[in-house]
Amino acid sequence: MKLEVNLKQNPYDIIIEKGALKGVGQWVKSLWEPQKIALITDNHVRGLYAEKVKLSLENEGFEVVVFDFLEGEASKNLKTVNKAYEFLIKNGMTRSDGIVALGGGVVGDLAGFVASTYMRGIHFVQVPTSLTAQVDSSIGGKTGVNTPFAKNIVGTFAQPDGVLIDPNVLKTLGKRELIEGMGEVVKYGLIDDPELWQLLDNIDGSVHSILENSETIIYRSCNVKRKIVVEDEFEGGVRMYLNFGHTIGHAVEQTAGYGKVMHGEAVAIGMVQISRVAEKKKLMPQGITRQIAEMCVKFGLPVDYEPWRVEELYTALTHDKKARGNSIKTVIVPEIGKAAINQIPLIEMKEYLEK
């Protein structure tokens, strides 16, 4: 399966194919001339796939060096970025060389940020290995790192030269790691794809059913994001729809401590809680919050967070990129498969969260 991200300046393809990882070297060679490549990954994925990917690249004439860091959201910071810069400099990486991001969302976000800022930008590709990365973070060109004050507050827009997705690698994920990716999948069904929502409604929510339907789930999710990114690359309008659940979700991730609540879990919590707020304000139809919550629970996703530290969440919301003065732009779902943007006063958000 192939999806074309037809951007005006940096078009690229998303390849979705079981077993595709075996041919990663040939795929990269179809994009770049043989050169030096920095393979950026985390310590967990390195043990699973890095040597296979390195060998595949070397067999196509690339010189490969490997940089890894401790897995997890807690590593997605400027300290790790500086270590990566130092590694690239010591290994003589130039602007004619490239980066292969091999891993989940943390790896992709960090490697993309490094690629877009090292020497003012070098080429990179995404080879995502988690469901969250395959359906969401590897596509669209958003890169970034966290600070103690806010998630993804430091970042760039930088498109990869390509995305290679092998659904087979999902089999090596732990149950929690696989299920958290369904938070983003549920989001796509809600904001733009009622057929995807129907598919999710029809399957039983087990790990087996997710893996059995993985190609369709990934393809439909990627297609939603592809369409939206092509229409609005730099988040001036409809791309904000992709943030459904993320406003409160990011605040939950930050206040819990990065890594304690996984990203997809936080998105599920965020979708349910913002829907609860919007339903009370009569911005969403009665009963839709229950539908969203039931879908999330079916897949084993959380819909609430305890302890619900409202003061800390409120502070995090005021630092959100979507905050404007005393209000914050939020995404709501007036009906399944349709999204809209609404401005909610921050003080109202706090009052609703307290209830």
Swiss-Prot record:
Residues that bind Zn(2+): E184, H246, H263
Main subcellular location: cytoplasm
Pfam families, per the entry: DHQ_synthase, DHQS_C
Cofactor binding comment, as recorded: Binds 1 divalent metal cation per subunit. Can use either Co(2+) or Zn(2+).
Record EC number: 4.2.3.4
Residues involved in NAD(+) binding: 71-76, 105-109, 129-130, 142, 151
Protein family according to the UniProt entry: Belongs to the sugar phosphate cyclases superfamily. Dehydroquinate synthase family.
Alphabetically ordered keywords of this record: Amino-acid biosynthesis, Aromatic amino acid biosynthesis, Cobalt, Cytoplasm, Lyase, Metal-binding, NAD, Nucleotide-binding, Zinc
InterPro entries: Dehydroquinate_synthase, DHQ_synth_AroB, DHQ_synth_fam, DHQS/DOIS_N, DHQS_C
GO biological process: amino acid biosynthetic process; aromatic amino acid family biosynthetic process; chorismate biosynthetic process
The protein's name: 3-dehydroquinate synthase
First-tier enzyme category under EC: lyase
Subcellular location: Cytoplasm
GO cellular component, one term: cytoplasm
Entry keyword Cell cycle: no
Chaperone listed as a keyword: no
Cofactor(s) of this protein: Co(2+); Zn(2+); NAD(+)
Known role: Catalyzes the conversion of 3-deoxy-D-arabino-heptulosonate 7-phosphate (DAHP) to dehydroquinate (DHQ).
Superkingdom, natural source: Bacteria
Pathway note: Metabolic intermediate biosynthesis; chorismate biosynthesis; chorismate from D-erythrose 4-phosphate and phosphoenolpyruvate: step 2/7
